Amino acid sequence: MEESYSARPLVGRWLALELRPTRPLTWLGPSWAVICGAVASGGLQLRGQSALLLIFSILLGDVLLGAWRALWLQPDWRDAMRRAAVNTPAWYIESDDGGGNAVRRLARQLSRRFRYVRSVILPVIDSEIIGMTMIGVLALSIGVVLGQTVVLLTIGAMGVALIEGQMNEERGAYLRAVFEIALPWLIAQTVFGYFAWLSLFYVLVFTLVYRALLGLLGGRPMRWILWNNLAQLIVALVLFASHAPAVAGLVALGLLAQVLWQSRFRVNRDGRAYVQCVQSYILVTMLATGLALWF
């Protein structure tokens, strides 16, 4: 990574923006959470303004915040930082035992740290710093257009991503589920101006479902199978109690289909294949649940 620094052109455009799908044929994620949140708000209409707000919400909740998280979590710059630190001259980092009063010693230490950052750290991660800065500015700018609450949710999402980067994969998966399901859903629901406490309950349950799917790709899969089934069963029961028996039946049928797929999963233990097979049922469950709040 650090070798690419010297190969960069000296003149030309400053920034590069690349948009591409990060996962082939995978729909369950922030974009779908935004759509379901917009539907759950009851404010999504067949009008040009609603379509524009939905596009801005997807751009914020998936593209920009996802890019922020990806830049922060990518391992390349962390490995490059470690290699650069190993090759750093000793005078950059050794302690200052020189004479002088405390103010002069402090000034020399600060000067050494500044040179270390400028000469060692910035050449390695300057692209990431610039990228995160620009993405943060764009995300907050869109948030300002969409409303004050969206700005707060955007700042919260950025903070969640930063905290996730300091955790291991198992514990960080909880924050990833919040980042990719709960916050995009709430952003869309806030954008369209309607809020229901029952919707907040549903988004928390679907965040748990998403966390369970992430867990199936790691260790202790049967534990997450149980959580996945229990969470969707709760959704079906709450829908039935909320006088939406048709949607409750649809959710129950989707859960039954997943249980049938689980019999195959117990044999081959292929979590990735199982998630790819059952995600369509969860997509329908999320959308139908959002519709049930207002129809």
Segments predicted by a language model, with ranges:
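Hydrophobic alpha-helical transmembrane segments
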Residues: 1-164, 176-217, 225-295
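Short acidic/histidine-rich active-site segments
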Residues: 173
